[in-house]
Regions:
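Conserved beta-strand signature within the Rossmann-like core of class I S-adenosyl-L-methionine
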Residues: 110-114
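Short strand-turn motif at the edge of the Rossmann-like AdoMet-binding core
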Residues: 72, 115-118, 141
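Hydrophobic aliphatic residue packing
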Residues: 53, 117, 172-173
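Core alpha/beta nucleotide-donor-binding catalytic domains of modification enzymes
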Residues: 2-109, 120-129, 135
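S-adenosyl-L-methionine-dependent DNA methyltransferase catalytic core
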Residues: 1-26, 101-109, 125-215
Length: 215
């Protein structure tokens, strides 16, 4: 399998493909963060780094079987200013569209998978229009102790969502940790009165529930 991964990061896509049992022949990665590239090459030294996605052409590559990527989400995310396609980072989605179109010149049946955040329906519809498919909504709370909704656009068929494992924070939090990691009395005296804390109270979760995004 020949794979082109856009916005590759530290190559989590390569990890997923390996765990799923796919045999990768060539893995081409578009990434500009030097630290992410360093991690990728340490784990997968055969990865061919192509650099800036805007300066790459799929026409210069061998026939591709799969194009994957998660274009920058800041312009779409409810946590940001929601500048949508006015945000230069969001416009990088169209590089995914361009490279997928180029990949189809050599392989009309090339598969693709695009990931992005939960967003307004109007932005979602634009992406769907360009890719020709509706997104699949996946919440990572099916297999982890966090609520993290993501959308996936793909022309790969024949798969189903996993059954929920019912995990909560209580299943993963280690309570036996050094004191230096515990919240201090000073925190309880000072922080709860701050505006930032008051605004974040809606995001507080007990151990009997899933967390927001885990770091």
């Amino acid at each position: 399998m020949n794979v082109l991964s856009l916005f590759d990061g530290m190559s989590c896509g390569q990890i997923a493909l390996n765990r799923a049992g796919f045999k990768i022949n060539k893995y081409y990665a578009c990434e500009i963060d030097k630290w992410a590239i360093q991690v990728t090459q340490a784990n997968y030294p055969n990865t061919q780094q192509l650099g800036d996605v805007t300066k790459v052409s799929a026409l210069d590559l061998p026939s591709l079987d799969l194009v994957i990527g998660g274009s920058p989400c800041q312009g779409f995310s409810f946590a940001g200013k929601q500048l949508n396609f006015e945000d230069p980072r969001s416009k990088l989605f169209f590089e995914f569209v361009r490279l997928l179109k180029e990949a189809r010149v050599k392989n009309p049946n090339v598969k693709f998978l695009l990931e992005n955040v939960k967003m307004k329906k109007e932005y979602q519809d634009v992406i769907s229009q360009y890719l020709g498919v509706e997104p699949i909504k996946v919440n990572s709370n099916l297999v982890s102790a966090q609520d993290r909704i993501r959308y996936y656009w793909t022309n790969i068929s024949g798969f189903t969502l996993p059954k929920s494992k019912g995990l909560t924070l209580d299943d993963i939090v280690d309570l036996d940790v050094p004191d230096k990691y515990n919240i201090t009395e000073r925190f309880y005296e000072k922080v709860p009165g701050t505006l930032a804390f008051k605004k974040s109270r809606a995001n507080l979760r007990g151990l009997e529930r899933c967390s927001k995004t885990l770091l």
